[in-house]
């Protein structure tokens, strides 16, 4: 099957940022503005990062629930915890999320906040078997829906590069890199000056740049001839992510002699992620705009605004097994294994541009727009991959009815991610599964996560909780990944309170403060790979995301 482009151009395929197999020289092009027509290794890894969601009690305890149970979150963490239920329960957990983006040494542009309401968990645990004789004490069937990832973020900023008249060095622009890319690959307009989208989608942003007057043909090369040699540039970026991964779960837990608890969960995931990236360059002058020779420009480009959008939809399937043992009163030891999740993902990509041209005297202005076709990877031609496997260990101790201390350790093997299917494309213009495998083995590593929680019950009807967690980076060397921000380390702190409203009703409240660090990234760059030297580059940007979650669980036991 071919990748489907919704237009009359026919079916063509995507191109990676470094199509060395198709080129004789060694120029590379990349950064945040490139390679959104396909999925990079870091995209698969980012989809595989789990979040600490569940019931408010589990969230308040930092997610340290591998050795605990009698909670709906057990289906997501260690299904053996279902075996600790003595009664049936139904609960629902609405959640409010607020994400705030911050990029160091920049000014705010459009906005940095995303606020969303969702359900962190909805579930039912049904006690389907109970016996006062024999080794099997009880069995509990669990059915639930749990949020496992939240993609709702936004970061937006502006920065400026000022022309230095003393050195005469032009400021770097995306228009420069588009010009170099089109020239290097021999992509030029036809004799009528038209340049359409009958090229692989990797080139579409640069072709938009031509149609938006960011670059023009001058002999055997493309040049940004409507941007003055003496221009300063303001770079503005707005990245908006939305969507989530939710997992429908069917689980079974068993209690054996009130000492050993075992369980298993079948997880079916639903994936939706939409990303919109707006990048704008505005060109400013201290005086009249001139070309390299000092000749005034008759017309100049005031700004160009490029928008790229990807939409990802799909499903995943996994299996979880676990056990908890109570060797002595008060002590619980738990272990759980999560198989890799097999994902099948449909994906679309499209882009558009708006630019403004004015004459040197600023007495007339023209607004230009253009858009690409829609690239669609779906059906048999979708993306398929398996996420890391996960191994969890937990220990907890209960001090009578007064307190619980719980600690978890988790190891996730990101170097074990494997891509199983990619859209069928033009040879040399799409990454093959074997190439992804090599990258994951060489550049990614297993992560180590530690979680801890403490619960105090000063009164039989009141519980106070605190917790926290830390996860190490999935990258062996984060400096190698500068095409886009890749989540590295993360940490969070949690707190909560629980109320026993009656014998059958409980109410829990939790707050979580989480910070994700990301690799530094370029907005755009071109590089001579053989020489190992950059040609044009934006400089590195450093973005972090802070999240606030408030969850409320209402549970009914019967």
Regions found by a protein language model. Give the residues of each.
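Bacterial Sec-dependent N-terminal signal peptides
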Residues: 1-26, 558
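Active-site-proximal flexible loops/turns
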Residues: 9, 85, 274
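Outer-membrane beta-barrel porins/channels
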Residues: 23-53, 58-59, 127-558
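Outer-membrane beta-barrel translocator/receptor signature
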Residues: 56, 68-77, 82-162, 246
């Amino acid at each position: 099957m071919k990748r489907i482009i919704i237009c009359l151009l026919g079916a063509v395929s995507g191109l990676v940022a470094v199509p060395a197999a198709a080129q004789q020289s060694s120029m590379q092009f990349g950064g945040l503005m490139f390679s959104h027509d396909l999925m990079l290794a870091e995209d698969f890894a980012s989809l595989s990062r789990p979040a600490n969601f569940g019931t408010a009690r589990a969230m308040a305890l930092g997610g340290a629930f591998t050795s605990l149970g009698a909670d709906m979150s057990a289906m997501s963490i260690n299904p053996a915890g279902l075996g600790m239920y003595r009664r049936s329960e139904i609960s629902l957990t609405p959640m409010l999320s607020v994400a705030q983006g911050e990029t160091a040494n920049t000014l705010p542009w459009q906005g940095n906040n995303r606020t969303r309401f969702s359900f962190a968990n909805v579930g039912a645990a049904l006690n389907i078997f109970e016996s006062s004789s024999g080794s099997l004490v009880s069995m509990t069937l669990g059915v639930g829906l749990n949020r496992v990832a939240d993609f709702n973020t936004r970061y937006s900023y502006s920065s400026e590069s000022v022309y230095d008249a003393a050195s005469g060095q032009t400021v770097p622009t995306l228009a420069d890199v588009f010009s170099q890319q089109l020239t290097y690959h021999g992509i030029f307009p036809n004799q009528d000056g038209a340049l359409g989208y009958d090229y692989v989608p990797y080139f579409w942003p640069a072709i938009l740049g031509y149609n938006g007057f960011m670059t023009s043909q001058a002999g055997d090369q493309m040049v940004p001839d409507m941007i003055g040699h003496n221009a300063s540039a303001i770079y503005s970026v707005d990245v908006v992510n939305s969507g989530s991964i939710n997992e429908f779960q069917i689980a079974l837990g068993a209690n054996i002699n009130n000492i050993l608890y075992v369980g298993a969960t079948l997880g079916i995931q639903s994936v939706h992620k939409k990303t919109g990236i707006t990048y704008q360059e505005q060109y400013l002058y201290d005086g009249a705009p001139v070309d390299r020779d000092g000749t005034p420009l008759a017309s100049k480009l005031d700004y160009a605004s490029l928008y790229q959008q990807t939409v990802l939809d799909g499903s995943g399937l996994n299996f979880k097994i676990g056990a908890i043992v109570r060797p002595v009163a008060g002590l619980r030891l738990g272990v759980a294994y999560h198989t890799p999740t097999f994902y099948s993902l449909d994906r679309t990509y499209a882009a558009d541009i708006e630019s403004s041209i004015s004459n040197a005297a600023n007495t007339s202005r023209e607004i230009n727009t253009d858009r690409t076709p829609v690239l669609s990877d779906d059906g048999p031609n979708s993306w398929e991959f398996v996420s890391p496997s996960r191994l969890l260990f937990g220990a907890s101790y209960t001090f009578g009815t007064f307190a619980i201390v719980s600690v978890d350790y988790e190891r996730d093997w990101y170097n074990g991610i494997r891509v199983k299917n990619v859209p069928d494309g033009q040879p040399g213009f799409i990454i093959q599964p074997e190439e992804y495998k090599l990258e994951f083995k060489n550049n990614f590593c297993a992560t180590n996560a530690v979680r801890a929680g403490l619960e105090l019950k000063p009164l039989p009807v009141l519980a106070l909780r605190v917790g926290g967690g830390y996860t190490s980076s999935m990258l062996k060397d984060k400096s190698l990944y500068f095409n886009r921000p890749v989540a590295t380390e993360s940490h969070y702190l949690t707190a909560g309170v629980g109320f026993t409203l009656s014998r059958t009703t409980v109410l829990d409240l939790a707050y979580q403060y989480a910070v994700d660090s990301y690799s530094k990234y370029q907005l755009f760059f071109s590089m001579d790979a053989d020489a190992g030297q950059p040609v044009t580059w934006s400089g590195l940007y450093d973005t972090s995301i802070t999240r606030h979650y408030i969850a409320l669980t209402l549970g009914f036991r019967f």
